[in-house]
Regions:
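Iron-associated oxidoreductase/ferritin-like identity signal
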Residues: 1-77
Length: 77
């Protein structure tokens, strides 16, 4: 079966817009997942690992914020 190339015809969402939505959702999911990982590390007394996950969580949060901002400006325009 040939691979279908979706460019927005089926979903009504252009790839570039879908990609922003996907990226933002993944960043938000990472923020939640990393909260669990940091809590696990803290429960085990591993402060270094907990801090590592908190830094990664902040990076994901920034990515989500940037994605939301970009998506918002594109939807408004």
């Amino acid at each position: 079966m040939p691979q279908l190339q979706e460019a927005g015809e089926l979903t009504g969402t252009k790839d570039k817009d879908y990609n922003i939505i996907w990226f933002t959702e993944q960043c938000l999911s990472n923020v939640l997942r990393l909260e669990t990982y940091a809590a696990d590390a803290e429960r085990e007394g591993d402060t270094e690992l907990a801090e590592f996950f908190r830094r990664a969580q902040e990076t994901s949060r920034k990515g989500a914020d940037q994605g939301k901002e970009l998506l918002g400006s594109r939807l408004a325009g």
